[in-house]
């Protein structure tokens, strides 16, 4: 039996133990004394939040217990949101996520553990959450949300948390939520910053009212490309849970005003709250239909950034071909940001970042100042093979003839040639 099989069996055993504990707890609950709709155990469990005046006492706790909340995405935002909503006693929680737990998730997606790697995120989350609070009914949807399955999923819920990281998902979640008149708590985060809002609530604006047009595909940076500080995304997910509790308990009733909260972790932590415009008369949300939603190609609407192909075949080299010339006389130019270069780099590589240096260099004199030997072959590498093409083209356009791009970058080198280097 290999290590992966052992970890799978261990994770399966933990899930079965959690499900058994939940069933046993439910059986006990049938025989436990209750008072005004909550068992004595629930009174003790939630007592410290029920005595907070802003929360709303027993009435608000019962609203949480009766609420059905759907969380789309069990990643960096979804994990803390789920932990605190389940801990707070939301009665039913749905989790939509078809992704698998990966080692690169663990620094920020704190519902998952090392033994969860390879498991469905929604099932890994369920195992943890059932142990956290067996009073909560947790439903998992291990599917990729689409305009074909979203209607059946959303129909049973009172509130949605958008914990996704792509514009296409955000517009889809918004449109289906508007169709069912379900409020949406939406958040996002990248690097050291993030934001959150509440949409489609108290006759307020929807996501489209704020953002009628999607961002350009080449302007959207993912966590894998731009990075993210774990506590930053955790703080934003926790703040989303706070907003969800306020919506569920009616804190904003008749007083809600559209807002956008911006968070920045560096240099000093700051929260800024901006008043936003209300519902727009020209927005699609005023006349949305199921037929219209099902007819939209959300990926096409938001644009997809396909592979960059700026160079001819003879201006590029595969990772295998580069491996065969690696010991010959040449210059390896690594154009990744210096932070990535420091994490993992090839011995002898020269780091001249594309974003901060090469892309801003406008004449050949400045290129000369970079001290690249013009007669030696130059091979250009980046993380995935996109920025390296831009850098190669620029060098070729400015007079360097013996320059080639390494296709697929460090990522492909790691997957196809050599795994004895750190990868991130």
From Swiss-Prot:
E.C. number(s) listed in UniProt: 2.7.7.-, 2.8.1.-
Pfam assignment, any one: Rhodanese
Domain Rhodanese: 326-422
Keywords of this entry: ATP-binding, Cytoplasm, Metal-binding, Multifunctional enzyme, Nucleotide-binding, Nucleotidyltransferase, Transferase, tRNA processing, Ubl conjugation pathway, Zinc
Residues involved in ATP binding: 76, 97, 104-108, 121, 165-166
Cofactor binding comment, as recorded: Binds 1 zinc ion per subunit.
Localization per Swiss-Prot or TrEMBL: Cytoplasm, Cytosol
Positions of Zn(2+) binding: 206, 209, 283
Alphabetized InterPro entries for the sequence: MOCS3/Uba4 (IPR028885), Rhodanese-like_dom (IPR001763), Rhodanese-like_dom_sf (IPR036873), ThiF/MoeB/HesA (IPR045886), ThiF_NAD_FAD-bd (IPR000594), Ubiquitin-activating_enz (IPR035985)
GO cellular component, one term: cytosol
GO BP terms in the entry: protein urmylation; tRNA wobble position uridine thiolation
SUPFAM superfamilies: Activating enzymes of the ubiquitin-like proteins (SSF69572)
The keyword Aminoacyl-tRNA synthetase is annotated on this UniProt entry: no
Keyword RNA-binding in annotation: no
Pathway: tRNA modification; 5-methoxycarbonylmethyl-2-thiouridine-tRNA biosynthesis
Gene Ontology molecular function: any one: adenylyltransferase activity
Main location: cytoplasm
Function per UniProt: Plays a central role in 2-thiolation of mcm(5)S(2)U at tRNA wobble positions of cytosolic tRNA(Lys), tRNA(Glu) and tRNA(Gln). Acts by mediating the C-terminal thiocarboxylation of sulfur carrier URM1. Its N-terminus first activates URM1 as acyl-adenylate (-COAMP), then the persulfide sulfur on the catalytic cysteine is transferred to URM1 to form thiocarboxylation (-COSH) of its C-terminus. The reaction probably involves hydrogen sulfide that is generated from the persulfide intermediate and that acts as a nucleophile towards URM1. Subsequently, a transient disulfide bond is formed.
Family (UniProt): In the N-terminal section; belongs to the HesA/MoeB/ThiF family. UBA4 subfamily.
Record's protein name: Adenylyltransferase and sulfurtransferase UBA4
Organism: Meyerozyma guilliermondii (strain ATCC 6260 / CBS 566 / DSM 6381 / JCM 1539 / NBRC 10279 / NRRL Y-324) (Yeast)
Gene that produces this protein: UBA4
